[in-house]
């Protein structure tokens, strides 16, 4: 049976998400993808509530085995880092309330899994993911967040077996 993995690229204005199906550890197929658009005119608290509500609905409908997020990283603007961290918290809570396992990877780890180099640009990730999964729609300028979400899900598909091995050795 195939495992369904959800990658999420969090944001305070756009949150990209993508689902992949993984069979026999190596066969990866795209399942579905999209983005949650949040209005800049809304107060931050309302955006977080909308993000929580929409992601909870998606999680309930799709019931993935795992949710994958980027680890927190520090922006040049400390306020942006804090706001993004709160969005990540909302996403972690939504998955946790539905008893879905959450995994986190550094952005450079996800880029390396998708492109082969950890310092790849967003456009390089977008191009490679669209080619690997044969999804031409990802090449649109406003789909970088979705491509990043696919890269995170693919990263977990590749690294999860090694995490299980690591746990068994400890």
Swiss-Prot record:
Record GO terms (molecular function): crossover junction DNA endonuclease activity; DNA binding; magnesium ion binding
E.C. number(s) listed in UniProt: 3.1.21.10
Cofactor remark from the record: Binds 2 Mg(2+) ion per subunit.
One Pfam assignment: RuvC
NCBIfam families, alphabetized: ruvC
Residues holding Mg(2+) 2: 70
Species assigned in the record: Chlamydia muridarum (strain MoPn / Nigg)
UniProt name for this protein: Crossover junction endodeoxyribonuclease RuvC
Chain sites annotated for binding Mg(2+) 1: 9, 145
Entry's Gene Ontology cellular component terms: cytoplasm; Holliday junction resolvase complex
Recorded superkingdom: Bacteria
Localization annotation: Cytoplasm
Active site per database record: 9, 70, 145
GO biological process, one term: DNA recombination
The protein's role, per its UniProt record: The RuvA-RuvB-RuvC complex processes Holliday junction (HJ) DNA during genetic recombination and DNA repair. Endonuclease that resolves HJ intermediates. Cleaves cruciform DNA by making single-stranded nicks across the HJ at symmetrical positions within the homologous arms, yielding a 5'-phosphate and a 3'-hydroxyl group; requires a central core of homology in the junction. The consensus cleavage sequence is 5'-(A/T)TT(C/G)-3'. Cleavage occurs on the 3'-side of the TT dinucleotide at the point of strand exchange.
Sorted UniProt keywords: Cytoplasm, DNA damage, DNA recombination, DNA repair, DNA-binding, Endonuclease, Hydrolase, Magnesium, Metal-binding, Nuclease
Homology family: Belongs to the RuvC family.
Subunit relationships: Homodimer which binds Holliday junction (HJ) DNA. The HJ becomes 2-fold symmetrical on binding to RuvC with unstacked arms; it has a different conformation from HJ DNA in complex with RuvA. In the full resolvosome a probable DNA-RuvA(4)-RuvB(12)-RuvC(2) complex forms which resolves the HJ.
Cofactor (UniProt): Mg(2+)
Catalyzed chemical reaction(s): Endonucleolytic cleavage at a junction such as a reciprocal single-stranded crossover between two homologous DNA duplexes (Holliday junction)
